[in-house]
Regions:
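Conserved, structured C-terminal
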Residues: 1-171
Length: 171
């Protein structure tokens, strides 16, 4: 307890604030930073907007694989953001993203919601999803369907970088 008090005292001039793991998770989702739920073993750097981390000059393990046809397909699932149209309904993690919720089964899914939070910055729910042709779907109105929660939520596809997309706050 003594150490905690001292840290808070010394940090006053820097306006430090304590936070927990849930706050850390919310920050990562709002910023579009990927974690375990987005990295499922099928995801490559280009799917998660991490192409800047892939060397164009140096050789590395897996470089040759990135040029295989399965990884260069234009309709690969990509990381995007998802916001409910009504700005109030939370989107359950694991929900399917579909064009038409009334389509005959099996309803062709475009992807799935990987993480959800309440955006403190914008005061509405926000989710990350991995969907086919993701970057070209930004601005589209689709549906998030959760069979487990028996919910169908009209959503809009947005950038995965919901808060501070230019990265000005971290500089």
């Amino acid at each position: 307890y003594f150490m905690w008090e001292k840290i808070m005292e010394f940090g006053k001039e820097f306006q430090i604030q304590p936070y927990g793991t849930e706050a850390l998770s919310t920050l990562r989702i709002e910023m579009g930073h990927v974690a375990g739920s987005e990295l499922d073993g099928r995801t490559i750097p280009y799917d998660a907007s991490l192409e800047g981390l892939v060397s164009k000059k140096k050789d590395f393990i897996g470089k040759r694989s990135l040029n295989r046809s399965a990884f260069t397909s234009t309709d690969r699932e990509k990381l995007v953001g998802v916001v409910p149209i009504d700005k109030t309904t939370s989107i359950p993690e694991g929900s399917y993203i579909v064009k038409d919720p009334k389509a005959k089964l099996p309803n062709p899914k475009l992807g799935h919601v990987s993480a959800s939070c309440w955006s403190v910055e914008y005061d509405n729910p926000f989710s990350l999803a991995i969907i086919k042709d993701g970057k070209n779907m930004i601005g589209q109105k689709l549906f998030a369907m959760s069979p487990l929660k028996n919910k169908t939520i009209p959503v809009e596809i947005v950038s995965s970088h919901y808060v501070d997309p230019e990265g000005k706050r971290v500089r």
